[in-house]
Amino acid sequence: MNLLLNYELFLAKIITFIIISISILILFYTIIKRKKNIQSKIKITLLQDNYKNVKNKILLSTMKNVEKKIWFKKQKEKNKKELLLKNNKKKLFVLDFKGDVYANEVVGLREEISAILLVANKHDEVLLRLESSGGVIHGYGLAASQLNRLRQKGIRLIVSVDKIAASGGYMMACVADYIVSAPFAIIGSIGVVGQIPNFNKLLKKCNIDFELHTAGDYKRTLTMFGNNTESTRKKFCDELNTTHKLFKSFIKEMRPSLDIEDVSNGEHWFGTIALEKKLVDQIGTSDDILISKMEEYTLLRIQYIYRKKILERFTASVTHNLSETLLKIFFYKNYL
């Protein structure tokens, strides 16, 4: 009896060992396979199919069986004709940009625009579905410059704002040949903000010294812990005004008909008022644009998919959320 129990125990250990070994091998294989598959790529989606599938489902749900047979027969003939005309159709490339403080989406935007420029001709168009409340000037300046590549190549750019294109977001939008805004989308905020807390008095109360040494009078203007002077404050304000002038001149260059002095006081407006001020060209939504162009254009959504490792994704998410929170509390200079 003891021998049988010992044998069963030994057998259980062997089976457990085999299961653990196989699990470890599977885990290693999965990790190696994932590493091979971790690569960035351009994803292309034919948006026509989505709209047509929804439309057809609704139509079929209202038909009788006899009507369905007739409809399917007509649809086959229609599909054959569309297949012949497909290559001659103009293309509408659809991009999405949901901006954060640093305009990190510009990494994908530059790749998407480069891909479009390789295949697009002057009859094609680009629709950018934009959503951004602005951020750092160098990030949004680069994003606007990427969009300007389309303009320089003579490819018509339409920007659709369903929710918000303010400050740096509007810097991007103004590059477009045509701006469409939802009635209550937030538009404008053409201004620059800079603010920073100063803990110098608190440090003195706690008997803590803070030393700051620079080579160059304006290597640092306002600091969080140093003693800020009137001259450094003036320099800080001068930098903000210089940035604002550059911002205004860029918008004026892109939209010459705009009364820049009237709209560049940092104020924002809803879409309907923005139309009156010529900040946008039409009231509508991105869905209106896509449906109106569905018959004439082939709708292609272009997405840059950046594959990250699990650890990289986690650390990037934590860092991004932390920096977003801190920047919302402590705004600093050159902030659109």
From Swiss-Prot:
Per the record, the GO terms for biological process are: proteolysis
Molecular function terms, GO-annotated: serine-type endopeptidase activity
Q: What Enzyme Commission number(s) apply to this enzyme?
A: 3.4.21.-
- The UniProt gene name for this protein comes to sohB
Give compartment(s): Cell membrane
- Species the sequence originates in: Buchnera aphidicola subsp. Acyrthosiphon pisum (strain APS)
The UniProt keyword set, sorted, is: Cell membrane, Hydrolase, Membrane, Protease, Serine protease, Transmembrane, Transmembrane helix
Name the predominant localization: membrane
Q: Which residues cross the membrane?
A: 10-32
Q: Where is the active site?
A: 167, 219
Q: How is it placed in the membrane, per its record?
A: Single-pass membrane protein
For this protein, the record's Pfam families field holds: Peptidase_S49, Peptidase_S49_N
CDD domains associated with the record: S49_Sppa_N_C
Q: What is the protein's name according to its record?
A: Probable protease SohB
